[in-house]
């Protein structure tokens, strides 16, 4: 429809023009209405209706400074108008002037207590201020006044979600959708809440509904990609991101999410490029800045020489980041995203990482201290007062970190001497979470912000904080960079020094540490007795699996190789064909990578080359199984003859589970603790015969297991007889108790 002409050469009929503009505005002809409002203000700059309505148009278009000027002029004429005050508040809020915006909405509500929109908009300001409980009160007042107010129902759901009350949030989102079925944002955030409830597949359905309504909704496309990433459907995640970036090429979060997908596809160069693009688009995107060095580290290496190249690139980028931070060249809050930068895959290079971890750890602690300052710590306990022990973990559920160490701390520490508090940072819950809840004096669960966790832990005044792992769960890594207790300790849940000056001690085991182990840690190394932990063997539901089902030959000696593929370094690929050539009819059983198929395919390609170099075919000897639930995994191990430990990063929980099935284990002890855990277990059992001193000895032992049935049977019998020596070792708990007493009480 053509624009309406203005009268030429005649005085403007202001009342008629305002009426005409209002009618056009009501019809949705915004450009024509805007033109008429402007013509009115050109001759009557004090026309209240034109000021207010043109302000609304500018506000909707995002021209916030102009909108603010128009509303301010209108308020000069009508200072108590609730509608104008509300528009003024929205403009202020959009410009980040949250305090002034809150005052404007308070004034609007004072003039009209039943103004549902003002209550809703007030809640929006409180959300921007991270005052979600107060925001919820405002949204609930809006809904009480106007029950069919879909936007307020939606906002109520958002606030509930931010408060961790996701069950209620889901109902609020569903109410908003029932009121307005075409409400795309409500469908999209319905998906966010479902995802938070662990219903990720259902969340994707909600994102798809949102996109069916509004096909280019950026948040829905981004969150859909994140959900697909979580479900390990990486190709579909890329499709969603391609769609997002086609319509919004400057979407920094989209580029960053694409980088995360590239990491899983083992494409580190592409991942780094995506991160760099995200930072170029948003210099305050601190998570992307932290993770750029991290993304240089692949999941799996193609050749040994790649390790040195990637390691050097990681160090170079980390030093550059430190230089930029120290020089003040980076805008934004660098505490945001720190936990996502944990260099998990650095530990899988087979080298001592103390210096690199210290480089990272010192930077992390410095950034956190600048943001949060010092915390008042607990005074030493009085005589007879229990020592307060806090355990910070994202793994208070059935997980190797829980099973090795953490569970025993929760259940076995002497309650007369120690008061145990659990800080469950993670999201997953199961029966083991309930075990933790029942045994802890106090058990606090997330999700919560870093600031909230800091305040909660600081208020509890722990004398000791124990971290079962640092480097696996992002928020744990952030909390560990703060000094919240006089004594703070890490542990072998992630067998790597933290590098954090805030972590005083690393708890390990005397049988798994080399003589020079102290040099591998930035922390003081504490060698607990034996393997360093009290292990309770799990009760596993029985399952039956045959060799035929698994593609294994009845005649073959079958080697169980159940470790994550990224534990297998390329320099040791030749071990498998060496064993095969000497052992004869044998097969190696590997577990496929749980993520992108590209990782498994790369490892298979490496093995094919190694076997071909030995004049053998990998397909004759190597079998790859998909991931399995525990009972089937255990049953699969039972049809094997020998567990072959991975070299330079030995098994922990997998070794314990193999020994529980009476499986002989062949291992080789290497320079670092993480390559010696299985060896420590076997020595604790009195089985040093299958602990090799070199890779050549390892190959010879594996071959002997195939060729000497009597030897293998004898080892199997001894495993069955002596495996109980590994279980329920209270010596490690008693030593931990004594260590804590000395560290806290100074005796």
Summary of predicted features, one role per range:
Residues 1-553, 605, 609-617, 624, ...:
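Alpha-helical solenoid repeat scaffolds of the TPR/TPR-like class and their adjacent stem/linker regions
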Residues 654-655, 678:
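Short glycine/serine-rich donor-binding loops of glycosyltransferases
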Residues 664-673:
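Short hydrophobic beta-strand element within catalytic cores of glycosyltransferases
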Residues 469, 645-651, 669:
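Short Ser/Thr-rich beta->loop micro-motif in glycosyltransferases that lines
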Residues 644, 658:
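Donor-sugar nucleotide-binding helix/loop cap in glycosyltransferases
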Residues 408-416, 570-585:
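Short hydrophobic signal-anchor/transmembrane segments that target glycosyltransferases
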Residues 659-660, 683:
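Short alpha-helix at the nucleotide-sugar/activated-sugar donor binding site of glycosyltransferases
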Residues 423-428, 588-605:
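Glycosyltransferase donor-sugar binding loop
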């Amino acid at each position: 429809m053509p624009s309406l002409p203005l009268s030429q050469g005649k005085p403007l009929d202001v009342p008629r023009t305002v009426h005409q503009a209002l009618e056009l505005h009501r019809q949705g002809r915004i450009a024509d209405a805007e033109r008429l409002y402007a013509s009115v203000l050109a001759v009557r700059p004090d026309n209240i209706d034109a000021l207010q309505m043109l302000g609304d148009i500018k506000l909707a278009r995002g021209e916030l400074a102009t909108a603010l000027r128009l509303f301010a002029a209108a308020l000069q004429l009508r200072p108590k108008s609730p509608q104008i005050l509300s528009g003024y508040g929205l403009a202020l809020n959009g410009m980040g002037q949250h305090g002034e915006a809150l005052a404007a909405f308070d004034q609007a509500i004072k003039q009209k207590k039943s103004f549902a929109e003002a209550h809703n908009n007030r809640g929006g300001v409180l959300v921007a201020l991270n005052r979600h409980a107060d925001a919820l009160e405002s949204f609930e007042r809006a809904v009480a006044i106007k029950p069919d107010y879909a936007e307020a129902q939606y906002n109520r759901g958002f606030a509930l979600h931010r408060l961790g009350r996701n069950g209620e949030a889901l109902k609020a989102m569903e109410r908003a959708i029932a009121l307005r079925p075409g409400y795309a944002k409500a469908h999209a955030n319905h998906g966010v809440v479902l995802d938070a409830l662990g219903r990720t597949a259902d969340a994707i359905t909600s994102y798809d509904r949102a996109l069916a309504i509004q096909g280019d909704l950026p948040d829905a496309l981004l969150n859909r990609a994140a959900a697909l990433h979580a479900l390990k459907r990486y190709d579909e995640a890329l499709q969603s991101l391609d769609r997002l970036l086609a319509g919004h090429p400057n979407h920094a979060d989209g580029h960053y999410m694409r980088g995360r997908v590239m990491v899983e596809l083992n494409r580190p160069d592409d991942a780094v490029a995506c991160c760099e693009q995200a930072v170029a688009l948003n210099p305050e995107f601190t998570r992307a800045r932290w993770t750029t060095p991290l993304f240089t580290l692949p999941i799996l290496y193609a050749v040994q020489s790649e390790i040195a190249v990637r390691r050097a690139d990681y160090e170079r980028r980390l030093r550059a980041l430190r230089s930029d931070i120290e020089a003040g060249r980076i805008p934004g809050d660098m505490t945001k995203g720190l936990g996502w930068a944990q260099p998990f895959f650095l530990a899988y290079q087979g080298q001592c990482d103390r210096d690199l971890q210290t480089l990272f750890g010192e930077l992390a602690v410095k950034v956190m201290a600048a943001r949060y300052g010092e915390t008042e710590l607990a005074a030493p306990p009085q005589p007879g007062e229990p020592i307060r022990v806090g355990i910070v973990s994202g793994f208070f559920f059935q997980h190797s970190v829980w099973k090795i160490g953490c569970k025993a701390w929760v259940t076995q520490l002497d309650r007369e001497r120690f008061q145990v508090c659990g800080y469950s940072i993670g999201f997953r819950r199961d029966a083991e979470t309930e075990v933790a809840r029942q045994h802890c004096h106090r058990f606090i669960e997330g999700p919560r912000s870093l600031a909230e966790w800091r305040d909660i832990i600081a208020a509890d005044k722990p004398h000791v904080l124990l971290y079962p792992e640092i480097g696996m769960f992002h928020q744990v890594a952030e909390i560990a960079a703060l000094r919240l207790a006089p004594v703070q300790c890490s542990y072998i849940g992630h067998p790597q020094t933290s590098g954090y000056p805030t972590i005083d001690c690393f708890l390990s085991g005397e049988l798994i540490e080399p003589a020079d182990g102290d040099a591998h840690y930035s922390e003081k190394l504490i060698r607990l007795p034996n393997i360093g932990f009290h292990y309770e063997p799990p009760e596993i539901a029985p399952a039956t699996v045959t060799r035929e089902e698994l593609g294994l030959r009845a005649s073959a000696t079958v080697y169980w190789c159940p470790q994550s593929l990224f534990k297998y370094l390329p320099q040791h690929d030749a071990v498998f064909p060496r064993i095969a050539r000497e052992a004869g009819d044998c097969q190696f059983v590997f577990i496929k990578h749980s993520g992108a198929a590209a990782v498994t395919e790369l490892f298979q390609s490496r093995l094919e080359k190694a076997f071909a170099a030995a004049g053998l075919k990998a397909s004759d000897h190597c079998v790859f199984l998909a991931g399995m639930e525990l009972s089937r995994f255990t049953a699969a191990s039972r049809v094997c003859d020998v567990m072959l430990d991975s070299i330079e990063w030995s098994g922990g929980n997998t070794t314990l589970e193999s020994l529980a099935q009476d499986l002989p284990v062949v291992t080789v002890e290497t320079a670092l603790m993480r390559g010696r855990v299985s060896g420590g277990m076997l020595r604790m059992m009195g089985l040093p015969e299958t602990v090799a001193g070199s890779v050549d000895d390892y190959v010879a032992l594996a071959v002997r297991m195939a060729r000497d049935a009597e030897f293998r049977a004898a080892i199997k019998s001894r495993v069955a007889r002596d495996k109980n020596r590994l279980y329920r070792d209270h010596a490690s708990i008693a030593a931990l108790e004594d260590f804590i007493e000395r560290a806290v009480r100074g005796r």
